[in-house]
Structure formats: structure tokens, C-alpha cells
């Protein structure tokens, strides 16, 4: 019979389209872990109507802590006592809040080059929540808070299906002020600002945690991870106190996707140069260099051709 004691959840922090789904899939290979796909409405229990994702320690009241810890424990017990692993992207703006609720959890932080992230993100701005995702979200949401999320879903469906808007109202991390920025930025510029604000906020919050708890955070860049995925995944597991068998590491090495390294080269060079002043400084902080040469038309055609074979879709950041 599984223990009714809450095991420290494994919390992976990372922006949208940064590789967190891949790494969550690797944790799912372990018999000791059950993964929970982005239980956003559980995390926002403190303030479901807030128009941004920034939550602090002050939001983690005793009632909120009790509710969220009980929800994680319930999921753990429903899965035979396995440790719960989750990777809700908006939690990148909630590090102090999460640390207050789960001080026993050691954190993992994944960051990715914003140009590569943008090439994946813009297409998602064009999609509303599908029926299956909606039903899952509905089951996860506290019954007293359903109306907050129903309104957002109806609003985005109305924009897409009735007004024929290309993009949903907001997709991805909502930093404070994003709705004002949306009025003056292009979608590509807004995605760039999302990356910058999330990176700055999360890094500062993690620095604060490490000042009092050295070694509490494992930080890795996506680009470094895929160069030696088995090694870095073993380090992640060790960081959170999870054993890992060689067979799992072999599978990680086999499954890691290294094909997306040059995906940013499909972006329109005009878009790349437009977001340069937004992202360049924060890229440098994370060890990235802004490209000095733009992709050639031949490179872009090759990447687009390859992607059409695998996905059949493209976003407005791409120019034929």
C-alpha cells in the first residue's frame, strides 16, 4: 500500500517550447515517477482571475499551501505512490510562490535560445485549446473557479471562429504588463518580450533561493542538454534524489531530438533583426550570441521543406 506521505514533487521550470515536454517524457520512463501535464489551474488557485502569471510568497497563504499540497498528494496516491513530476510553463513566473509551497523540492531550470523558441511558439499562438485538452483542464480545475477559465476559453474561440482572428488573445507566459504591450508589439516582438521577462524573473528568483539554499537549483541550457542528454539527465535525477538505470539513460540518448538546433534559421531575417534590441542583452546573460549572419534563402527553403514533411504547418514568422 503506497505511503500517504507527500513525496517532494519534481518541478521543472522552463518557458513554453523550451524542451520541457521532452524532458518530462524522459522522467516518465522511470517506474518511480508519474508525470502530470501542466496542471495550471491547480497552481493558480490563489488568484485564478489574475491577468498575469506572477505569484509571490505572499500568495502562498496557509489555505493555498494546504490545497495545492493536497492536490499533488492526491495525484501521487492515484498513481501508486510515485513521485509527481510536472512542468507548467507559467511557473517560471512563480518561483517564490512554488518554493513557499514546496520548500523541500529541489528545482530544475531549463532555458533555450529565444530564436529557436520563437520559431516554435508563433504557430501555437494560432491554436485554441482542443476538446481533449479542455476536458482535462475542466477536471483539474477547482469547481468554484470554473467560470474564470470558461470565460478565457470562450473568448479565444470567439476570436478565432467568429472574428476570424489569426491569433488567440494571449498564449504562453503572461508577464505583468503583457496586455498593454500587445497593443504596441507585433506577435513576434511580444514572444521575444515574453522570453526576456520570464528569463529575468526566473533567474533572479532562483538566485535568491540559492543565496539561502546553495545547490537547490539545477540549471541547464537546452542546447547543452541535447549535446549529452544521458549525462545531463543523470545529473537531473541525482539532483532531485531519483535513481536512474542505465537502460533509461540509453533510451534518453536515443530519443533526444538534436534536429531542432537550426530551426531558428527558418525565421524571416526581418523578424530576427526586429527582435534583436529586445532579446540581445538577456541572450548574452544566458551565454547566447545573437547571430551576425542571417540564414540564406537556400538554408531557409531546406528547413521549411523538412518541416513540411514532418508537420505540414508553418507560422507567420516564415516567409515563402
Regions found by a protein language model. Give the residues of each.
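Glycine-rich phosphate-binding loop used to anchor ATP phosphates in small-molecule kinases
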Residues: 72-94
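Short aromatic-enriched loop/helix-cap "lid" or pocket-rim segments at secondary-structure transitions
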Residues: 46-50, 98, 119-124, 129-133, ...
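Conserved phosphate-donor/acceptor-positioning beta-strand/loop module used by diverse small-molecule
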Residues: 87, 98-124, 236
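Short beta-strand segments
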Residues: 12-14, 84-87, 109-111, 219-222
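PAPS-dependent sulfotransferases, especially Golgi type II membrane carbohydrate sulfotransferases
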Residues: 1-10, 133, 147-320
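Short catalytic/ligand-binding loop motif for oxyanion handling, primarily in non-cytosolic enzymes
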Residues: 21-24, 43-45, 92-95, 115-120, ...
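PAPS-dependent sulfotransferase catalytic core
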Residues: 1-79, 128, 137-149, 255, ...
Amino acid at each position: 500500500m503506497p505511503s500517504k506521505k507527500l513525496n517532494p514533487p519534481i518541478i521543472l521550470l522552463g518557458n513554453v517550447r523550451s524542451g520541457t515536454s521532452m524532458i518530462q517524457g524522459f522522467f516518465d520512463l522511470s517506474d518511480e515517477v508519474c508525470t502530470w501535464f501542466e496542471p495550471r489551474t491547480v497552481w493558480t488557485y490563489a488568484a485564478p482571475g489574475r491577468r498575469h502569471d506572477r505569484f509571490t510568497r505572499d500568495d502562498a497563504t496557509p489555505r493555498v499551501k494546504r490545497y495545492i499540497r493536497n492536490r499533488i498528494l492526491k495525484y501521487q496516491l492515484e498513481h501508486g505512490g510515485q513521485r509527481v513530476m510536472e512542468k507548467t510553463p507559467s511557473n517560471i513566473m512563480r518561483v517564490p510562490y512554488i518554493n513557499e509551497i514546496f520548500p523541500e523540492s529541489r528545482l530544475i531550470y531549463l532555458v533555450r535560445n529565444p530564436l529557436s523558441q520563437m520559431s516554435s511558439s508563433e504557430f501555437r499562438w494560432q491554436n485554441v485549446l482542443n476538446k481533449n485538452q479542455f476536458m482535462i483542464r475542466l477536471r483539474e480545475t477547482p469547481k468554484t473557479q470554473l467560470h474564470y477559465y470558461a470565460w478565457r476559453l470562450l473568448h479565444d474561440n470567439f476570436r478565432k471562429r467568429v472574428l476570424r482572428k489569426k491569433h488567440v488573445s494571449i498564449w504562453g507566459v503572461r508577464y505583468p504588463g503583457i496586455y498593454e504591450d500587445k497593443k504596441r508589439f507585433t506577435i513576434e516582438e511580444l514572444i521575444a518580450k515574453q522570453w526576456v521577462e520570464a528569463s529575468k524573473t526566473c533567474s533572479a528568483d532562483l538566485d535568491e533561493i540559492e543565496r539561502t539554499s546553495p545547490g537547490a537549483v539545477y540549471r541547464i541550457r537546452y542546447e547543452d542538454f541535447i549535446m549529452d542528454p544521458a549525462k545531463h539527465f543523470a545529473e537531473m535525477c541525482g539532483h532531485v534524489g531519483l535513481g536512474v538505470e542505465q537502460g533509461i539513460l540509453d533510451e534518453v540518448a536515443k530519443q533526444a531530438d538534436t534536429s531542432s538546433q537550426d530551426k531558428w534559421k527558418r525565421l524571416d531575417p526581418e523578424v530576427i533583426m526586429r527582435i534583436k534590441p529586445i532579446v540581445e542583452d538577456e541572450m548574452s546573460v544566458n551565454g547566447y550570441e545573437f547571430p551576425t549572419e542571417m540564414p540564406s534563402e537556400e538554408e531557409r527553403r531546406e528547413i521549411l521543406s523538412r518541416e513540411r514533411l514532418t508537420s505540414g504547418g508553418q507560422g507567420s514568422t516564415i516567409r515563402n
